[in-house]
């Protein structure tokens, strides 16, 4: 039996174990998935003991999607371009990093039949998830992509020079956007009572996507729904990226895993 899992901080809320273990059982895959709640100073030991603990692969979530890069021997496109990794395959002599969030986000839009070509898009946040969503929207030919961040100067170091980056306090013309994506943990399980931004005036039929999936409908999504938006949480993205990760961990891939 091989071990797989999720590393992050304060992540006991994650639905990943249920998704993965159900899939393993259904497809007779000899894997088990568990949570690894790690502090920053525990990552070194976790990496050193991967083979000892029979770990075949692992996912990475907040706040370590960029931190993990220093431990990898190879980073596969588009993770290398994004500069963030959420899936690691453990081979005999090396660790390989991937970004299956990228795939999961694109597949979730396809699931809801949302075509973002020519959309004006707003990304809330500037961390690893935000970079992933930015490159996915570029791949899908979104017309215009703007980033809002609490620290725009720091954010500018992470994105292409041509990207428009604003202080989140200064962006109040939300009716210009066709798609708004929250890539922060604000509104998620550890910050349920907060919203990353006020949605007082948004375009009718605007798509508001919150990558958080717990609670199912965050305060941001509730407000968006009240204002006529089509709302999406991160559950489908989580599922699609999980299947992609499983495919990478299995030697020859598995049915439905890619």
Swiss-Prot record:
E.C. code: 1.1.1.25
Reactions it catalyzes: shikimate + NADP(+) = 3-dehydroshikimate + NADPH + H(+)
Pfam family, one: Shikimate_dh_N
Single GO biological process annotation from the record: aromatic amino acid family biosynthetic process
Pathway named in the protein's UniProt entry: Metabolic intermediate biosynthesis; chorismate biosynthesis; chorismate from D-erythrose 4-phosphate and phosphoenolpyruvate: step 4/7
MF terms in GO: NADP binding; shikimate 3-dehydrogenase (NADP+) activity
Active-site residue list: 65 (proton acceptor)
Enzyme class: oxidoreductase
Keywords, comma-separated and alphabetical: Amino-acid biosynthesis, Aromatic amino acid biosynthesis, NADP, Oxidoreductase
Any single GO CC term annotated in Swiss-Prot or TrEMBL for this entry: cytosol
InterPro entries xrefs: Aminoacid_DH-like_N_sf, NAD(P)-bd_dom_sf, Shikimate_DH, Shikimate_DH-bd_N, Shikimate_DH_fam, Shikm_DH/Glu-tRNA_Rdtase
Residues that bind NADP(+): 125-129, 211, 234
Residues binding shikimate, per UniProt: 14-16, 61, 86, 101, 213
HAMAP family: Shikimate_DH_AroE
Purpose: Involved in the biosynthesis of the chorismate, which leads to the biosynthesis of aromatic amino acids. Catalyzes the reversible NADPH linked reduction of 3-dehydroshikimate (DHSA) to yield shikimate (SA).
Subunit record text: Homodimer.
PANTHER family the UniProt entry points to: BIFUNCTIONAL 3-DEHYDROQUINATE DEHYDRATASE_SHIKIMATE DEHYDROGENASE, CHLOROPLASTIC, SHIKIMATE DEHYDROGENASE
Family according to the record: Belongs to the shikimate dehydrogenase family.
Protein name per Swiss-Prot or TrEMBL: Shikimate dehydrogenase (NADP(+))
Source species: Clostridium botulinum (strain Hall / ATCC 3502 / NCTC 13319 / Type A)
Upper taxonomic lineage: Bacteria, Bacillati, Bacillota, Clostridia, Eubacteriales
């Amino acid at each position: 039996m091989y071990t797989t899992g999720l590393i992050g901080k304060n992540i006991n809320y994650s639905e990943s174990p249920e998704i993965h273990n159900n899939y393993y059982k259904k497809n007779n895959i000899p894997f088990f998935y568990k949570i690894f709640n790690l502090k920053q100073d525990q990552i070194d030991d976790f990496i050193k003991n991967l083979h000892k603990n029979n770990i075949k692969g692992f996912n990475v979530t907040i706040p370590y999607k960029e931190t993990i890069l220093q431990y990898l021997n190879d980073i596969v496109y588009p993770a290398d371009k994004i500069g963030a990794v959420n899936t690691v395959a453990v081979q005999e002599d090396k660790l390989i990093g991937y970004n299956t969030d990228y795939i999961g986000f694109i597949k979730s839009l396809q699931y809801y039949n949302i075509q973002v070509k020519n959309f004006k898009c707003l990304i809330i946040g500037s961390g690893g998830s935000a970079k992933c969503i930015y490159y996915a929207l570029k791949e899908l030919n979104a017309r215009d992509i703007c980033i809002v961040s609490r620290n725009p100067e720091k954010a500018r170091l992470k994105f292409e020079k041509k990207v428009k980056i604003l202080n989140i306090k200064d962006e109040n013309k939300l009716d210009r956007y066709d798609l708004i994506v929250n890539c922060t943990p604000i509104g998620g399980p550890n910050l349920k009572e907060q919203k990353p931004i006020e949605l007082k005036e948004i375009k009718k039929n605007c798509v508001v996507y919150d990558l958080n999936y717990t609670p199912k409908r965050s305060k941001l999504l509730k407000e968006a729904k009240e204002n006529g938006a089509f709302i999406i949480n991160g559950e489908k993205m989580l599922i699609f990226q999980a299947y992609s990760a499983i495919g990478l961990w299995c030697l020859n891939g598995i049915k439905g895993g890619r």
